[in-house]
Amino acid sequence: MIAACMVIPVNLIGTFRLGELLVLALYPFYMKQILKALRNREVMAIVGLGLLWLTSQVLSDLYNATTMKNSLRGLGSIFLTMTTFLFFCGLYCRNPRNHLGTLLGASAGGVLSAGLLYRFEGNNAGYAENIWDFYVSGWAHPAFAIFAFLFYRSHPWLVFPLGIAYGIVANMYGGRSDGLVVLISTLFFVYLWFQVTHSRGDLRYSMRSGLMICAVLLVPLFLLYVVYAQSGALGKAAKMQIDLAKNPYNPVEVLLLARNESVIALDAIYEKPILGHGSWANPGHLRRLYLLKMREIYGAAAPKKLIQDILPVHSVLLGAWVFGGLAGFIFWVYVIYRTFYLSNQLLINGSMGMIAIAVVYVPYFCWHVLFSPNAFARFSWPMSMAFLIFANAFFMRPNAAPKR
């Protein structure tokens, strides 16, 4: 229910989601489980860094004389991220398999979101050009995680073609990042299957070696992407980005063209690296600099003005640093590190179903923390991170005996 309601906006001081309001309403009923979850060292470390991030945001807002409205929006975003995380920790501390219900809810929410967008924004040209991102990925990605959980152990050859098809179709219909993370997960699934069948189930070094192999295999996939993007088969946006690249075979240049907001984020961080610019910062000189850089890249096709009321950063990691200072950056670097660590521990100790969900999450987490806006941090990350923590805690019990 909560995961499904995360797509329904409620406008108060800022934009809440109905799911967040339900979390706050249910807190008293789950307080006992939440307090129990706080005994977990992983939870305490994340909460401690979250409090440090919140404190840094308060200091940043005071230093930058941020308006009360914007300060409440920025502080509220951090507060809701952490309270939602703690709620799901309480929900999963007894049984991490409860996460399957959350995934079902997230998939249902994706269907609901697609229906609402089509009903009220069906004529929006931007949505039509990016069908996958706006109408499909919201329900398809959690559905893929559920499918992997159910079938990877017993029928892995069903998971492989589905993941490859997902990646190809997503790229064809504008979901390049979503297709990429699922292709990486699928490559890892193939590697993991060979490891399980040829190493008697010993997966101790599989995370490190698997990621290295995936990185190598991504090279020919990137070359194929360039060829098809240049031909126009992957849509206008992909073709324009490839055509603008001085060297289309340079993946860093192509990535920066797709996520050009990172450039202005680095300028903003350079100006105020310790405390940042404050909640919902929107400095006029940085906006003008961003538009100037866009004209240098896109020429006449560059935007003439910015309609957002916040500096366009498009990165959870860099955004936390730009608006809240260095402590926000440290928080999300720690999250990425623990995601790899906890996923690796699941590979060693967990059941194959739980491992499958972790494999889906690793590239998903990394991509969205690095290259997606703050919505990921508030609406998707809390439930997923809580799952990784308590799936590990479940299989680390003395009497736990995972069935591969």
Set out the residue ranges of the language-model regions:
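Transmembrane signal-anchor hairpin modules in multi-pass inner-membrane enzymes, especially those
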Residues: 1-62, 67, 93-98, 149-158, ...
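Hydrophobic, aromatic-rich transmembrane alpha-helices
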Residues: 22-36, 141-153, 326-346
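Alpha-helical transmembrane segments of multi-pass inner-membrane proteins
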Residues: 83, 87-124, 131-196, 222-223
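A membrane-periplasm/extracellular boundary helix in multi-pass inner-membrane enzymes
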Residues: 168, 172-173, 193-249, 267
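Transmembrane alpha-helices of multi-pass inner-membrane enzymes
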Residues: 146, 338, 353-404
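Hydrophobic transmembrane alpha-helices and their immediate junctions
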Residues: 309-311, 322-363
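Long extracytoplasmic/lumenal interhelical loops at the membrane interface
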Residues: 252-256, 263, 271, 275-324
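Aromatic-anchored transmembrane helix interface
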Residues: 19-27, 42-58, 65-90, 101-112, ...
